[in-house]
């Protein structure tokens, strides 16, 4: 067996609770399996997107900007644009209509959609403006449902496919952040 990591964790992920020590480990039937696993782990470290991203100058992070908030550099943004064009082209072939929606919405939008009760703990805190509470958008579907509900539709128009490669924001705990794989700012469709 091998101890792979030691870290701290709050009981039930609540900062008000006691800090516990978390120990991660792996076990194998024999030494050969352990060595094969260690070799695979080393190969995975060499392929880690954070290492490759830094070496190829694709993206960067900086604590001054904020943890979990990656910035794409010119080399990475070229790849980003090519992927986005490819995805949008495939969606257009399948009848998707592309839209653009705001990065914020009212708390009431998320309460109406039913997302508030399930996702508010993973949302950035609400901002108060002119007597209304707004949040950074954690997902696209509530905005898209408002576009759908904007006018009546015949069953003959169905299905209506709405696409948007949108910037979304979730308040992920710092222990779960991992380069562009898991961040507090990301794009999804």
Label each residue range with its predicted role.
Residues 1-177, 181:
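Auxiliary tRNA-acceptor-end handling modules of aminoacyl-tRNA synthetases
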Residues 185-187:
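A short glycine-rich beta-alpha junction/loop motif
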